[in-house]
Amino acid sequence: MSVPQRLVIATRASRLALWQAEHVRDRLRALYPACAVELLTLTTRGDQILDRTLSKVGGKGLFVKELETALLDGRADLAVHSLKDVPVDLQAPFELCAILERADPRDAFVSNQYTTLADLPAGAVVGTSSLRRESQIRQRYPHLSVKPLRGNLDTRLSKLDRGDYAAIVLAAAGLQRLGMGERIRSLLEPEDSLPAAGQGALGIEIRNDRNDLREWLAPLACSRTTACVVAERAVSRALGGSCQVPLAAYAELNGNSLALRALVASPDGTRVIRSQHAGPAEQAQAIGQAAAQELLSNGADAILAELQDPPAS
């Protein structure tokens, strides 16, 4: 295998996105010491729209389009993403080439006054950026007030610190990667807040005509994480998964046995449809599809129809 002379990684400009890209850069430099690995920092539309939730302005694709443009015009060779922000169906000519080992997939409870969601008094304001978290919080704690929370990690924490929220819920991996794990008051187990498909994992996107990159990037891929994420994203794909759908999917591997949990909820949390499926890891795609079909059969289809065509108020 010939060693690349130079590789350029496209990344978003946020501190967390830069950490993720630098992590991949450092892994590549260790693998290929003679290769010059550089970062191309870009601002995406998702980074610019901070006054509305993603579910109202176009969803996950807002975080990848500018990076894909850089892949297309040759300014970058690969793009690094937080996998939960990547649409399940990438448009041609793009593909996910490698999925790295997953970090902590759980959601984190962050507050300056309280230790858990259960400690919050009635009417306390909880901030979160996703309908998935919002619906699960509303189901378990209907006495709380859940409000949208946008911005990068530092912005979200500053909004908490100035008193806009009593608590916020966000992905644990982001805090831990940036050395801010001490801000976490408690971790929400999957039983309490089922994670998003791909949460905690990083994905590398390339153009599908870059066969050379597939070979060079293969050592970064984690087969166990990939199996779990394939099952999770199969659920999301079958249900038209986007930021507009309160959808969660989380798989775990025990040996070669893959166990998948998934749910679809109404945004107000009054209806939560759950599914569990298991099987050999090599059947990850089929396991995800089976879980999605069970969700649809048990009432998720009605929730999805309402989200696509909300009733007139």
Swiss-Prot record:
GO terms for cellular component: cytoplasm. GO terms for molecular function: hydroxymethylbilane synthase activity. The modification S-(dipyrrolylmethanemethyl)cysteine is found at residue 243. The keyword Transferase applies. It is an enzyme of class 2 (transferase). The porphobilinogen subunits are added to the dipyrromethane group. This is Porphobilinogen deaminase.
